[in-house]
Amino acid sequence: MATNGHFAAIGNGSSDKTAYEHGVQVIDENKEFNANLSKYLTLEDVTPAGFNYHLISVFGSQSTGKSTLLNHLFGTQFSVMSELERRQTTKGIWMSKNKNGGDSSMADNILVMDVEGTDGRERGEDQDFERKSALFALATSEVLIVNIWEHQVGLYQGANMGLLKTVFEVNMQLFLKDRATSHRSLLFFVIRDFVGNTPLQNLQRTLMEDMSRLWDSISKPAGLEHSSVHDYFDFQFYGLPHKSYQPEQFVAETKKLSLRFREGQKDPSLDARKGEFSDGGVFLPEYHRRIPADGFSHYAEGIWDQIVNNKDLDLPTQQELLAQFRCDEILREVMVAFDEAIVPFEDKQSQAARLGEPEILGGLGAAMRASRSKAFKSFETEASRYHKGVYQRKRAELESKIDTRLKALFQGQLDATHKSGITEFSEAVSGAVKAGQKKGTGYDFAEIVNEEVTKAVQKFKEVAHETAVEGAAWSDSQQQLALYEKELAEVSARLRREEMRRLASRVERWVQSRLGESVGLEFNALGSGRAGGGAPEEGEKPTEKKFWDRVWNVFVETVLDAERRFTDRASSFDASLEEVDVGLWRLRRKSWGVLRAKIDEEMVEGNLLLKLRENFEDKFRYDDAGVPRIWRPTDDIEGIYTRARESTLTLIPLLSRFRLAETSAPPPLDRWVGHTPSSATAADEEDLPPIGGVDEEEGKSLEEEMTILSESKRQELTVRFKKAADGVYVEAKRSAIGGMTQVPLYFYGILLALGWNEIVAVLRNPAYFFLLFVCLVAGYVTYQLNLWGPIMKMTEAASNQALVEGKKRLREFLESSDTGRQAIAMSTAGGAGRGEQVEMSRLNKQGKTTAEDEDGDL
């Protein structure tokens, strides 16, 4: 606390409102500026007022009642001089807000500065503070109240002519720095102790003559020599009665005077040069310094810093510096609110990017639009009152900062939509294809792809539209949409290629199954070389010569059928002709590989030897009609054997090379496979085995490709077959020789002589004869039905079963009696003794064991 009670002096950092109840000290007597001025303005609700505030300063000699005048006009509580002591009361510059603000006739937010009086004995000859305070008041205030007594009008010191000359000089100093703008101020002369003997108009004329004389006496820069005081100042005058002698009139007149502190408009019909002055509102728009209330404290501090350091005061520069400071401050405040809304989305997006899991952020677009609009609106509301150039520059900076971050979020949202859309598209297409396959019904792959592409593009557009910020150039998503559609097309093509690969695989498996069955039948037919077997029913010549023709025809027909299947199915994929050509080309190559693998499987040495033996046995053991041969000694076994063996041996050179009987040349595999399509890629060829005669880089000819058995294999196979055939021949010879054993004829004569009596007895006895007849008929029927073998086997099985059952019943009988159990026990004990293990020893030639021989050597 200082001179004024309940005024916050410099150094009082209290935030208690009672400390600022009556006002605040702006500058103390030591020329120190109060940094808490902004706190006072905030407590008085002046800070949010923008330009809706007014600043008044009062000048006058010390102890002339300046503070008293302000207290009556504005209801303030500035300290006044004690009647008992004639000494300085106001030190420095003090400020208070109008306390009569409830009167609607007065302007809002009137700030009053009580300036230290001049010509005081405390400062004496030191006029430095007087000049600095005048310059400060002129740079900040709209209205300068000059408080003088009536009897001082016409005097130089008493009428504050020295102070007014200082005001004119500092105003010219300010004007020189900003010639583009004419800073006008109002000098309001309040004539105290006005008794009316001298008319107010005469006092006005005297004061104006003094003003003109003072203006003419100051030095002016080039070009302003003939300027007038009216070019920079307006004047108003008012007389007040004596406070002590006419207290009631004084209060009434101050009340009336206070009503003039309101907004007004300049009356163009009045001419101050003719002594015509306004008696309306004192706050004209041209008086306002256009400093927003929230920046006034910083502006005033900058002005005072320039003044107290004796630097040339440059108001435009100070306004720009203030604008720079306040715009930066407002920008930071706006960005804090912006961060609260946007940082959570940035964190989510960056975390999703780190995890590699793109996430579409819900509500991002609304948050971006709301935060951007709120930030710009808040900045515009608070900062647009400052220097236009600085405001526009800082607004562009704010827009750049906000849009840079929002653009990153927008791009991240589109990227997440892009990546997740591609993944979902692939999964949706694959799922639809699998569902169609499980149902077993046909599905249109092209229709599935087109439908999913439409869904994916629609979702991308919806997310882009929801996230877009109207008016922001960076929120145009057409380029990203084009890239998205391009990648969708690439993924569609890749999925189509994969589906065609799967289709080709299914067709290849079908070809493999069909060829495995058809070619297997042809090889199985090699086991029968007679007519009616593997050969046609007509003709006697074996069909082995056209074996490869039949294999090739089956192969070509199967592949043609597969190609039709492939082409029909590929048409539903919306595949291009080039893709279909590549698929058919791959199918033919893969099919040849399947055929060759099947041939190699059938031509394995063991399988082929078995086929040759079966072919030989079929020709050797069966006649041309297919009837099995019963070898007799009179048969030409050697001739049949030779013909069958030689016929079978002709198969080995036939099977060793894939040749067509019609052309005696390999099949046209190179023409059948065709040239590599121009649209085929390296990926299309990497899994294809090389084919001799088709792939030049393979280095194998078509003849080599068609070679099934090498020369060494043929010779080895021939030798092994001949050995097998020889075994069959030896077996046939043994069978023929074994059939030569017969019963001698004389044996039947002996049998007849010795058994004649029995024969006669049987023939004479009807019962025996009938029984013999029945037995002969039964034997004949059994023979004709070829049932002797089964009957013998059944008899043997029945006898064995009867033996087992008899043993079982005997054991049960023995176990049921004590004697039997003892016999079984003795048998078991004896068997156990006889079952004792004895180690066997190896004997040498002399009949001795090895151990005995070694003992003998020792």
Swiss-Prot record:
Its EC number is 3.6.5.-. GO terms for biological process: endoplasmic reticulum membrane fusion. InterPro entries: G_GB1_RHD3_dom, P-loop_NTPase, RHD3/Sey1, Sey1/RHD3-like_3HB. The chain crosses the membrane at residues 743-763, 767-787. Its main location: endoplasmic reticulum. It is found in: Endoplasmic reticulum membrane. Residues 1-742, 788-858 are cytoplasmic. GTP binds at G60, S61, Q62, S63, T64, G65, K66, S67. Keywords: Coiled coil, Endoplasmic reticulum, GTP-binding, Hydrolase, Membrane, Nucleotide-binding, Transmembrane, Transmembrane helix. Residues 683-696 have a biased composition (Acidic residues). This is Protein sey1. It comes from Aspergillus niger (strain ATCC MYA-4892 / CBS 513.88 / FGSC A1513). The lineage of its organism: Eukaryota, Fungi, Dikarya, Ascomycota, Pezizomycotina.
